[in-house]
């Protein structure tokens, strides 16, 4: 098992300062991290996304297993997770996602309601990105699973079209 250095994302909808679970988790991972009470902390990312890649941290035991030599001779905090997966694709099993993760693990700390989001399947995501890369930032589908770490309210799904029509006054 290896410790990961995570990436913070600050958005206006995040919780502020120490009230944010994201800030608390980042502080527990990195004792040098200073929580700014006036700053919002919205998301903590663990993955290979280029906007917030995780690092696999040195732990002093690099010479004791198959990771020996991966960090090279340079000093530093560690290597990017994507580099580890590119050099050791078997860590992902027999999946087709060699060198990358097929998911992004996030912890969210939400203070304000988020906008409605629509997540297309993989084929539609590829088509949308190919035709409108200005609107669709990548060709990935985005299936989601939520696990509540604290109290929250969430809405999921929509009424069927015919049922919506019953409430329309047009």
Positions of the model-derived regions?
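Transition-metal
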Residues: 1-170
């Amino acid at each position: 098992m290896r410790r990961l250095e995570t990436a913070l994302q600050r958005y206006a909808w995040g919780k502020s300062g120490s009230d944010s679970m994201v800030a608390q988790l980042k502080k527990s991972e990195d004792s040098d991290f200073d929580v700014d009470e006036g700053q919002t902390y919205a998301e903590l990312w663990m993955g290979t996304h280029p906007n917030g890649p995780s690092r696999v941290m040195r732990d002093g035991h690099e010479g004791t297993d198959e990771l020996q030599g991966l960090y090279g001779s340079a000093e530093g905090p560690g290597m990017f997770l994507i580099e580890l997966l590119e050099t050791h694709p078997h860590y992902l099993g027999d999946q087709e996602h060699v060198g990358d993760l097929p998911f992004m693990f996030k912890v969210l700390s939400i203070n304000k309601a988020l906008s409605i989001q629509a997540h297309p399947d993989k084929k539609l995501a590829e088509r949308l990105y190919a035709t409108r890369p200005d609107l669709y930032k990548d060709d990935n589908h985005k299936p989601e699973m939520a696990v509540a770490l604290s109290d929250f309210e969430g809405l999921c799904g929509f009424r069927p079209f015919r049922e919506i029509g019953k409430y329309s006054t047009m």
